[in-house]
Amino acid sequence: IRPLIPLLIAAGILLGGNGLQGTLIALRGAQEGFAPSTIGLMGTAYFGGFLLGCLAISRIMKAVGHVRAFSALAAIASAGTLLLVLMIDPATWSAIRFASGFCFAGLFTVIESWLNSGVANRDRARVLAFYRIIDIGAVTGAQFLIPVFGADGFSVFAVMSIMITLSLVPVSLGDRSNPVPPADVRLDLGRVWRISPVGVIGCVAVGITNSAFRTLSPVYAEQIGMSVTNVVTFVSAGIVGGALIQYPLGYLSDRWERRAVLLLTTAGALGAALALVFFAGSGPLANFVLVFIFGAFAMPLFSLSAAHANDRA
């Protein structure tokens, strides 16, 4: 794992910057008077760019290699972060978020393909588990930079740009090998549907739900009267809940009927979401507990749906 340490450091810095951006966009947008629907559309733009980036990055890596692809995409993402605070306008922010989604999809693909190519099969699960720990830790920790620097000024945007730029250093100075790029992606949604309608419906529904949570949960928390510190704690509680329960639910679904686990997990997420609606005014602690439970049930649903589809592939 030692040769991969620079790459994992870069991943941690980059993931922290990306996780910080999602929450900050929602908070700053609300402060600027953007409607929740407008902030939601910005989230849609980000994930649209992310989808396109997933489809295009293999060609970029084949053309210029991993290091150059990473450097170019990180530079664009860093510049876009600064443009957010220089050009405060919903349409401009949506365009920047689309470009950011494209860049971050490419950056994560570069990192993950590099990790996979640089580790033996016997060590792969441990390395990827360590990567996921870094992911959750960086995203959760970065949230608390918002109350430190404030969401209403330039400083926190500069910090995000610095984090994205610094991720270039370990990649540029670390392992100079050039792994084989991933194969081109071809979508055949009809075939996927024929293999597992339940898996397709689950992945699509969970993708919509969880992306809406990541985009709009800061706005919801602010509108029910939470302070900035409590807003980022609320968002972090949902993320941590999903991280902690991923493995136990995966373990259960490997041993029980997977559709039954999917049904029970969906019911748990629905119950927690309804409880959040009814107990919104009950104080921060109740909301932290409920959003933790929501994340614990909602976040693993994608993995469970994908596993169900893979069972039939």
What are these regions (language model features)?
Residues 7, 91-97, 199, 283-290:
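Short hydrophobic/alpha-helical segments at membrane-entry points of transmembrane helices
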Residues 1-47, 197-202, 210-220, 224, ...:
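Helix-loop boundary and gating motifs at the non-cytosolic
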Residues 147, 161-181:
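C-terminal membrane-cytosol helix-exit motif in multi-pass small-molecule transporters
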Residues 98-133:
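Cytoplasmic helix-loop-helix junction between adjacent transmembrane helices
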Residues 53-66, 150, 245-257:
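Helix-to-loop junctions at the C-terminal end of transmembrane segments
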Residues 259-303:
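C-terminal transmembrane helical hairpin of 12-TM major facilitator-type secondary transporters
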Residues 106-119, 299-313:
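Intracellular juxtamembrane helix-capping segments at the cytosolic ends
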Residues 68-82, 161, 260-275:
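Structural signature of the two symmetry-related core transmembrane helices
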